[in-house]
Every structure is written in structure tokens, then in C-alpha cells.
Regions:
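C-terminal outer-membrane/trafficking sorting elements
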Residues: 381-390, 394-460
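Surface-exposed, glycine-biased beta-strand/turn segments
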Residues: 21-175, 209, 218, 243, ...
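Surface-exposed, short loops/turns at beta-strand junctions within beta-sandwich domains
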Residues: 347-353, 433-438
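Aromatic sugar-binding surface patches on proteins
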Residues: 333-346, 426-429
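Solvent-exposed serine/threonine-rich low-complexity stretches and specific carbohydrate-binding patches
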Residues: 324-335, 420-426
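Edge beta-strands of extracellular beta-sandwich domains
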Residues: 366-374, 452-458
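Short histidine-centered loop motifs in beta-beta connectors
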Residues: 141-145, 149, 182, 186-210
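Short hydrophobic beta/alpha edge segments that flank linear recognition/processing sites
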Residues: 178, 207-222
Length: 460
């Protein structure tokens, strides 16, 4: 579905103490390019597989023999949620809606009579809603930050898994997907999932609304991690869950979103400007939460559906709660599917030590992130990572790539409790399977020079 292109921003540095429209040091827009999510032959095979499964499930009494003609009885919740242990305010953007213009190519119309959809010369008109991850999509995919959940209760009538999930271009590759039939006979397709992330429930099993079906990946014909959500009528016709001037049927959403659902996804602190790498390499966020007086600090904000003229007020607060600096910014571009902006600043050598706060206020919503300024010690320093931990997610043993020995290793559970500690680790492996419980763990590596680095690891 996507690969990123980034519109470079201005290369400035420094802050004005209480500036109003402060130009960013860098940033820009992120527009996922389109790719045919499912080829005609793949779609034909999927529909045949689903028909076979439905017939078998009806024979087994797991599905009704027939469904009454709509009126619609199903109401959809949003099919994506953030996994436990993560703190972004939002995790997605929308790149494409259903195409209502049957002509092709380059003849598109979404439900709002806009052009946020696509077609191609082979006759494909986009048949679903593409929901992409933002920011740092492959990083989010690798740590399984975005969970795909059942938009409505129903019965699983199809599953595909085991296909490669780091694709970067349109292709004939098969995807990983779950298909759920609802009580009114409509069917939801959840496509491009991460390999081996799918629910263990079998075809014929029931799922509740909001139940986890898998996590977002880039399997199949895809240019980056996203969910392709597609809705079908009991007779197989493509349905648009959105209602608007060019799709006048009632909305399927329990809480319909606006066409431009402008929101701030997160604010982050960086030691250097974030780097967006070429697909499928994870990005290099250069995140940090610990600084010393005199260090270079990068404050960044990440948006989806940002519109021209929408102002954000940014403020940095000192440990005593007073304002260190504040400024505002608004984009002049009509619309970005996703965007980011950052400002760089050198902290004064006399900067007060303690916990600081970076805050952004946008469209009535406040998002903030704390960072520390203080003396360098083994618990606060943040330097470029020397270690890589893989595989991640893991089922048992995690490999360490980096200098050995590690002076001390501490593993924390989601409650912040130390569940394992190892002194003077000399072998490049950690057996996390011994911890028993699946979930998100924090691995803290104390280096020989007295500094530390931390890694999040998901254990299945």
C-alpha cells in the first residue's frame, strides 16, 4: 500500500524565547503511495475459498443457512487499537477510501466526492479503507504496537497466514488476513497482517466485537505496514462503511469520523533529527528522554490529516512548572495524510536539573512528554544504541548483537518490576521464555562504561 516520501522542511536552529509563528527546523508531509491490495486472480481465489468455507460451516451448523436481506443490523467499531504498554495518542492515518467511480484509470471519487482513493489501468477500483501506521511504521509493526480488532462480532470464515510481511511494492504476493462474517451476513476483510500474529482461533470460531485478530503488517501487495479493511454484503458486493454525498447509504460506523479527522498522533523528544529509512528498514527515531545541560534537544510533533491554518501551541516547561519557551506553528499546505515537524535547541549550560515537559495543544487536545535534564549517571544517560535484540517479537530466546560482556542485564515486566537480572552476561543470548507470561518487557543493558540502553521486547 505504501512507501513514504518526506517533504523536507527548513533547516533552522534555536528557539525564540516566546515566539509566535516559529518556523520548524525540519519535517514535512508523508503521503503513502497507492498499490493494488489484491489482484483480480487473488480476489477470485479468496472468494472461492470463502464460499467453500461458508458452505462447510453451514453444514456443521456454525452459520445460519441464509441471511435475511439487509436492513443493516451491524454497527462497526474502529478496527485498530494500540497495544498495551504504548503511549501514542493516535497510531494511524487514512490514505485511501473506497473508489465509487467505476471508470478507470485516474477517475476516482471517494464517499465525500473527494479524491482520497485510487484505481489503476487494469480496472481495479480501490475496494476498502487503507489505514496506515504513523509515525515510524516498521518500528511500530516490529513491536506489534497496532492491534487489529474485530469491528463487529461474528464468525471467522477464512484465514491466511505464513506469508512474507515486509513487502514494499505492488506484487502478486499473498497476504495474511482474517475474514469475519457478521450476524446480518455481511463480511469484513482484514488484510496485510503481520506473519504469525493472527488469532489462534480456527475457522468457524466466534469472535467478539473488539477482540484481537492480529497485528498490522505489510504482507501481500503492499508498500508498507497498513490495514486494508474491506466490507462486503451477503451477496459479495463491496460496501463502503462511510456515508457522504457520494455514498448516500447509512454509515456502518457506531461513531462516524469526519472526512478530515485531524489529530496529533504523538510528541517525541530526540537527540538528533528522526531519520525515515527506505522500506523495509525500520526508521531511526533517535529518541531520547535524558539530557545534560548544554545538550542538543529536538522536539517533534506527529500528525494525521493536518490541514492548512490549524495552529499548534508548543510549550516547554521547566521542573518548577514555569515556561521555558513557547511558540506556535501551522501548516500552509491544504492537507497532509500525515506530517511531522521538529525544532532543535541547545539547552543552556545552566539549565535546571530535574523533570521537564514538552507539550503540544492542537484542536482542543493536549499531548505531552516528559524528559530529564541532569547529571550523567547510569540510570539517565541515553546514547546511540550499541545493541540489537532479535527476533522481536520472540517466543523464548532473544539474540544480542553487540559488545560482550554486558555488565548487567535487567528485565522488567509491564508493571515495572524486575523479573530477571544477570551480572556479567558473556553469551549473546537471553532466555525470556523462562518468564512464562507473554507481554511487553523492557530489557535494560548496563554497559561496561557505566551507561545504559533500553529495549522493548514482545514475548509471545
Amino acid at each position: 500500500m505504501k512507501n513514504a516520501y518526506l517533504t523536507a522542511g527548513l533547516l533552522l536552529s534555536g528557539f525564540a524565547g516566546f515566539a509566535q509563528n516559529q518556523a520548524p527546523s525540519g519535517g514535512g508531509g508523508y503521503q503513502p503511495p497507492a498499490a493494488e491490495c489484491v489482484s483480480a486472480s487473488q480476489r477470485q481465489q479468496m472468494e472461492a475459498d470463502l464460499a467453500t468455507n461458508v458452505a462447510r460451516l453451514r453444514q456443521q451448523g456454525l452459520l445460519p443457512a441464509a441471511h435475511a436481506a439487509r436492513p443493516m443490523t451491524v454497527s462497526l467499531n474502529w478496527p485498530l487499537r494500540q497495544a498495551a504498554g504504548f503511549d501514542y495518542a493516535n497510531i494511524h492515518g487514512i490514505s485511501n477510501f473506497v473508489d465509487h467511480n467505476a471508470a478507470y484509470p485516474n477517475a476516482v471519487q471517494d464517499y465525500n466526492c473527494g479524491t482520497r482513493t485510487y484505481d489503476n489501468a487494469s480496472g481495479y477500483n480501490h475496494a476498502g479503507t487503507d489505514i496506515f501506521l504513523w509515525p515510524f511504521s516498521y518500528n511500530m509493526m516490529d513491536r506489534q504496537q497496532a492491534e487489529i480488532v474485530a469491528a463487529a462480532p461474528g464468525v471467522i470464515i477464512g484465514k491466511y497466514d505464513g506469508n512474507y510481511d515486509r513487502n514494499c511494492a505492488m506484487s502478486n504476493a499473498n497476504w495474511n488476513a482474517v475474514y469475519v462474517q457478521h450476524t446480518d451476513g455481511s463480511v469484513a476483510w482484514y488484510g496485510h497482517m503481520k506473519t504469525n500474529s493472527l488469532t489462534t482461533k480456527a475457522i468457524g470460531a466466534s469472535v467478539a466485537q473488539g477482540e484481537r485478530l492480529g497485528t498490522v503488517g505489510s504482507s501481500g501487495s503492499s508498500t508498507g505496514p497498513h490495514l486494508h479493511f474491506e466490507l462486503h454484503s451477503p451477496t459479495g458486493a463491496v460496501l463502503d462503511p462511510y456515508s457522504g454525498p457520494c455514498s448516500t447509504a447509512a454509515s456502518w460506523w457506531a461513531s462516524p469520523q469526519t472526512y478530515y479527522n485531524s489529530a496529533l498522533n504523538t510528541v517525541l523528544l530526540h537527540r538528533a533529527a528522526p531519520v525515515f529509512n527506505t522500506c523495509p528498514t525500520p526508521d531511526t527515531p533517535n529518541e531520547s528522554s535524558a539530557y545534560r545541560p548544554g545538550d542538543r534537544l529536538y522536539t517533534a510533533a506527529y500528525y494525521h490529516d493536518q490541514l492548512a491554518g490549524q495552529s499548534t501551541q508548543y510549550t516547554i516547561y521547566q521542573p518548577n512548572g514555569t515556561v521555558f519557551t513557547t511558540w506556535s506553528h501551522s501548516s500552509s499546505t491544504a492537507h497532509y495524510a500525515a506530517s511531522y515537524w521538529y525544532w532543535s535547541y541547545t539547552l543552556p549550560t545552566t539549565a535546571p536539573t530535574g523533570t521537564w515537559r514538552f507539550q503540544a495543544q492542537y484542536l482542543g487536545t493536549t499531548v505531552s512528554r516528559n524528559f530529564t535534564v541532569g547529571v550523567v549517571n547510569a540510570t539517565t544517560v541515553a546514547r546511540p544504541a550499541q545493541y540489537t535484540l532479535y527476533p522481536n517479537p520472540a517466543t523464548d530466546v532473544v539474540q544480542l548483537s553487540g559488545p560482550l560482556p554486558v555488565a548487567r542485564v535487567e528485565v522488567f515486566n509491564p508493571l515495572g518490576q524486575v523479573v530477571r537480572s544477570i551480572d556479567n552476561l558473556r553469551q549473546p543470548t537471553l532466555n525470556l521464555g523462562e518468564l512464562g507470561a507473554a507481554g511487553l518487557y523492557l530489557v535494560r543493558l548496563h554497559r561496561a562504561d557505566g551507561t545504559v540502553e533500553q529495549h522493548k521486547v514482545v514475548l509471545h
